[in-house]
Amino acid sequence: ETFKTIISNRALLAIIGAAIVLLLSQFMGQTMNQYLFASYFKNINALSSLSMVGLPLSLGLATVSGVIASKFGKKEFSAFGMFLAAACYGIAYFMKLTNPWIFIGLYVLAGIGVTGFNMFIWAHITDVIDYNEVKFGERNDGVIYGVYSFSRKIGQALAGGLGGYALGFIGFNAAAQEQTTQVLD
């Protein structure tokens, strides 16, 4: 009965999908950036700059996110963050950037969007629990939190391996002094 409720709860399935995509984008981006800055941009120091900029921006966003969400709504704030991230990642991908600083700017903007969504994902879980109660007449807080937490673990595991698989798929060779043009393109 509980399993049937879980697979029938579209809100839960949507938030699980969003969480997995979020984790894949965060962890795969972190994995790929190490190789991107070393092999493509040939500027590993720029990666340090990216790391130093990210934390203060996240902390700054944390201080104002409640006010922004109160004004516009948590769902709207989260959706805007994900659209911002998708747009920035898309621009970075299709422009074939060669300047690491432009890439960092886009990556930081995308990070702000992802962080905005990530800050409210647990608030969305309470909405999923409320939806479950309205739709099925059962609260099931523990089950929903447990299923969601487990799905995040799956997302983290997938993200950890996916970066390596992606590098292998494009032909990256860790032992090579220079990567082939195929890998760099």
Question: How should each PLM-predicted stretch be described?
Answer:
Residues 1-185:
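Membrane-embedded alpha-helical bundles of multi-pass transporters/translocases
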